[in-house]
């Protein structure tokens, strides 16, 4: 079963593990991830922003996080994506669409 939902506080550790896999996958492109900074960013998004996780048969396979911010040229706000990560094995249109639809 496919499900996209906001994680509860107990699921944030699982989200942290998933996002650290992003660093492993792209280690030749990005600097080493600071686990503390990643954890703080996740907590900030949980408390003040937006997080949505994708689960397939109860297994976390993807996540998107965003924060409301102002345009640089306007006082109007928009939802700025901080991360969007899906495990390589699960990268399908259905999963990415499910995550991004929650941002509306």
Segments the model singles out, each with a brief description of its role:
Residues 53, 59-68:
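Conserved beta-strand in the GNAT
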Residues 70-81:
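A conserved beta-turn-beta hairpin within the catalytic core of GNAT-like acetyltransferases
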Residues 98-104:
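Conserved acyl-CoA
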Residues 1-34:
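Short amphipathic alpha-helix that is part of the acyltransferase structural core
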Residues 42-53:
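A short helix-loop-beta-strand connector motif used in the catalytic cores of GNAT acetyltransferases and
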Residues 82-93:
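A short, internal acetyl-CoA/4′-phosphopantetheine-binding micro-motif in the GNAT/acyltransferase core
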Residues 37-41:
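Short, basic/aromatic recognition patches
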